[in-house]
């Protein structure tokens, strides 16, 4: 167990598997919880006693060992250690995972830490982790190189084989062609021979035939032919002709012709045969060449294919690189190409493997640093992000592989309990269901792996295990959320931490406590300011242990047990003892919502009958309580220290002033005001008017005798001074022996009675006393009695006897509070008495309707009819008609209100209530007696139909309907506003919670100028704004130069009066905005604590006060403005609460104003229906040259020249002189004896003004503006203002803008509260160039830390970092705080914790929230004093033991261990605190009053 005071800081980091195992008391292997029959935990299950400890104190599981005497024994039978059952809240178990799983925070966070570290996109990382893709985790370069060579050789061989095949085919083709051609040659020859032979045969036949015919003819020569003689178709001799020699000649001719024809035919046939053969040869050759080409192409394409294939496969081989993501197909292909060259895997195991093998943080950091310095744009941005993660791991000592879990811790069973319900069923924490899923899947996976199941089944089981662990850590972060029975989403470990119901906000920052109760409140008019009425029954229950102890002490009971019985039976003696006990005790009363510190105050309890708590009427304002059914809670501070603190700091009579404004918060109101107003009224003509009395006593005697009315004006002689103006004549007669004036005063008996109730220094006030007057009396009383100058030493001695020996300032404050409280009580009693005596009440007849009302309405209706007529005639637009009518009715309502006011009887009860500000105002009265007027519709637009009736007359149905809009809107707005205001308060608290006054003076020379000219803008007096500040520079009389006050002097009331008299318009004051304290704020910069009227004390939690002061009135702010027109105009800017949020979140405002970007002159331009505003900045540079006597200009006046042009040269040829040359381009100006070149540099910035935008006041053509000045109306964007005008301008702007909103709603808040918040918004700087620091570009650093680090670097001769001021909204600022506990308990818990764990963040517990979370005394108020005392004690011890040294050295020798322990204590105390007195430390009621709050679970449940 942690000893609560033994540490000064808390560190969060990643847990290694060894850490998890070292925490664990055993492995949970079964998903079972408890046995349904025995209802005892199952062995090795989620509630196993052997692992987590026994369920009953000092008793083992099997019952072998019972009682405390066996403490520490481990049962040999069931293995359970005999110890207390509360160890089940502390002891953890573990689950050994069959396969590593990733921690979802580091995978799915933005940015993904795992992804950044490995340079893998979140999408790819997710695909690997959830078994959708492979990742290469190892590459064997040697095998890869061998495989490359083998591939190249294989393809080389393939190429050669194909080429060889192609060559052999070529040879084949050539041989075939040769053969074919040879065959054709021989065929041709045989054809020729055949033709030759054929024709030879034919010739022989013809010749033979001719020979035969010749022979015949020769034989028959001279004879006549018997028939036609024919030769080859030609008739030689016709029948009957004689055969002659000619006939033979003709035959010879015919024979020759025939043979010649035959020869020709032969030649032709031979030619044909030859041609045929040639064609065939050509065909064959062509076919062969085509075949060869085809073969070549095939070869080439095959070779190309091989080259491509080889290239692809080599590329695939080269693509085998670490971290490459592969899908199933790619993985298979690569495995074929390069078996053994790489190893790819899926899931968290693969990622872990990759981290262990490849991530060398030092080397990676070096590479990334180089990249950051050498690249630009997106690459630099990414490198910076990665470097941030790498540096976080390096500095924190975390190992990246710890982001992957191999062992899963199981939280103690009592933190995830299982309880039996009435019906015998069990209710269990969702965590048990989630753990059960993990265990089931893990066991199934182990079994599958043992069985060597197919890869796909194992893979699926691993994915399911990963999803189960994800659901356990953060259900719903990825994919669909796991839901239990009844479809509700199971609450995971992350859900246990985050949100309003999470561990931080529900159990650590606010706990339900014992010794508390609540009841309805009723008014207690007879109580003193510091008292409350506590019902007896309630008190008895609250103080039960104290009563029991006193009963035993008095002997009324023998022991605690019998005392308890007596109390429970409520015997009569119990009440006396209770009276005795309660006498010394204070109780705390609290009314929710606790919007500021005055919502919890301490009171002395006064026992009363009944069941309601009685509350003093004057503290109602602080609690914002009324008696219409409000409830309040009562708490009892237990320890002496708590009682003392409640008495000195929380008692209601010491909380008279509001911490937000410094005004009294216990101002009398309502009946009291009415009573005092009635008492101090003058009624002319009342009984006894005008009588004269020699003294006050004489006048009172006359009143007692009934001779004078209480309100009758009378004349009284009296001695003394008047306070303030008198509303009746005063005549100074003379002075008494002490110099006090004697006067004759016109006053009333009522005023005499009233003044008699005032303390001596506050008399005599001779005027009508309303609410404001009573507030002044309370304020004056407090100021008078807390001013040490007004107290004598005798007074101080009296005070010392009451409060002990304390600082004089404290004594004055306590005494002033005491006197003011008693004065307030006297006024309260008087007010109630005369409110009763006066009998003021309200009846229907008191509401009198003014006769002028009908006239006003008739006149308004007449004017409206005229406007309508003009509209119908087309003289005015719809918009103008609407505006006119609204204005007419608003004026009518105003006139009616005036008439009501005039017609009112000033002595009537209604008028008295309104005029005294006791209740109600004239507008409400006007609605009752005048007219209700105009109403808004649901959109906020004013309905032009007025409600002419009032409540006295009653509304018509239509009027009632119209008025419901406004009513409903009011209610809806209020509901929305309350939630918004609450959230704003929470953000403000978070951003400012570590702002505590830590030192006296930070020593800064900087401050803040407060100008009288700002008064109009922020609606507050200059004097009011400087009051309570400390001067940052001496204040000087502007006329004489006399120093009125030195630097660091407080501006008190006297000095503000002096400033007003001398007309001083600006004062340079210390401000939280300029404070340079390393942690918190210094007293000088903060100035006066408004709640005490004195300089703030060290330890005051000014941040919390500021946040409460701004947040508490938030509900009063209207939600949004209603504009009168239908169309939004540029002045329809956000107001009220949304505007406050806009300011504090540093958002771009709605209706943003255009600002001048540079100093210059305005030009208004209109181009193509577009309005442009141009700002032109002109800079003139002049280059003058003196002209020597013999020089003449060579350029004309007004000429344009360039740099290097000749301007003048010598007119004497005998002199060898240089010409005068222009040193810059520009226009020439020639003067007497000199020549100048004037260069004009123009810079132009142009913006387009929207049509709706209206120009800001004073913006016209030729107007001179400065950078950051408004060109159009609207709110400036604070980020733009910061860039243009710098830090101071934006600070002033934010403070003034916030004040405008609050003041316009009549809410007073002191500037310094807003300044505290604005300071937090501007605390950070963004690193631009890191120089020699170890910062990273873009990192957000605390400005004081930045300055300190740079100073160190400069002192070592290094190059400092550069940075720009950042303006962060309060939400962002809260999340960038140095304390991870504060940030995690605010918002985005998982993101904050993820970041903090990786960086190994250390929380030095400097703020309030972090100390509350871990249950330590807060470093504020009395906590800070306790710290200092203890630190001084330890320093004293150290001074006696060791020489002082700043270095903390690791001591190895045993004799130094004691010194080191002392050092540790000192460190713990200086940076932390002590827990104060706990119940029982004083030995008062240690046995009888165990504190039964849930405090002992805080360590385990973080």
UniProtKB/Swiss-Prot annotation:
Gene Ontology cellular component list: DNA-directed RNA polymerase complex
GO molecular function: DNA binding; DNA-directed RNA polymerase activity; magnesium ion binding; zinc ion binding
Keywords: DNA-directed RNA polymerase, Magnesium, Metal-binding, Nucleotidyltransferase, Transcription, Transferase, Zinc
Assigned EC number: 2.7.7.6
Record's compositionally biased regions (Basic and acidic residues): 279-293
UniProt entry tagged with the keyword Nucleotidyltransferase: yes
Cofactor note: Binds 1 Mg(2+) ion per subunit.
Membrane-spanning intervals of the chain: none
CDD domains: RNAP_beta'_C (cd02655), RNAP_beta'_N (cd01609)
Region annotation Disordered: where it falls in the sequence: 265-293, 1472-1502
Residue numbers binding Mg(2+): 626, 628, 630
Catalytic reaction annotation: RNA(n) + a ribonucleoside 5'-triphosphate = RNA(n+1) + diphosphate
Annotated binding of Zn(2+) 2, by residue: 1002, 1075, 1082, 1085
Binding site for Zn(2+) 1: 60, 62, 75, 78
Cofactor(s) annotated in UniProt: Mg(2+); Zn(2+)
SUPFAM superfamilies, per the entry: beta and beta-prime subunits of DNA dependent RNA-polymerase
GO biological process: DNA-templated transcription
InterPro entries on file: DNA-dir_RpoC_beta_prime, DNA-dir_RpoC_beta_prime_bact, RNA_pol_asu, RNA_pol_N, RNA_pol_Rpb1_1, RNA_pol_Rpb1_3, RNA_pol_Rpb1_3_sf, RNA_pol_Rpb1_4
PANTHER family, A to Z: DNA-DIRECTED RNA POLYMERASE, DNA-DIRECTED RNA POLYMERASE SUBUNIT BETA
Function in brief: DNA-dependent RNA polymerase catalyzes the transcription of DNA into RNA using the four ribonucleoside triphosphates as substrates.
Family: Belongs to the RNA polymerase beta' chain family.
Protein name per UniProt: DNA-directed RNA polymerase subunit beta'
Organism per entry: Roseiflexus castenholzii (strain DSM 13941 / HLO8)
Lineage summary: Bacteria, Bacillati, Chloroflexota, Chloroflexia, Chloroflexales
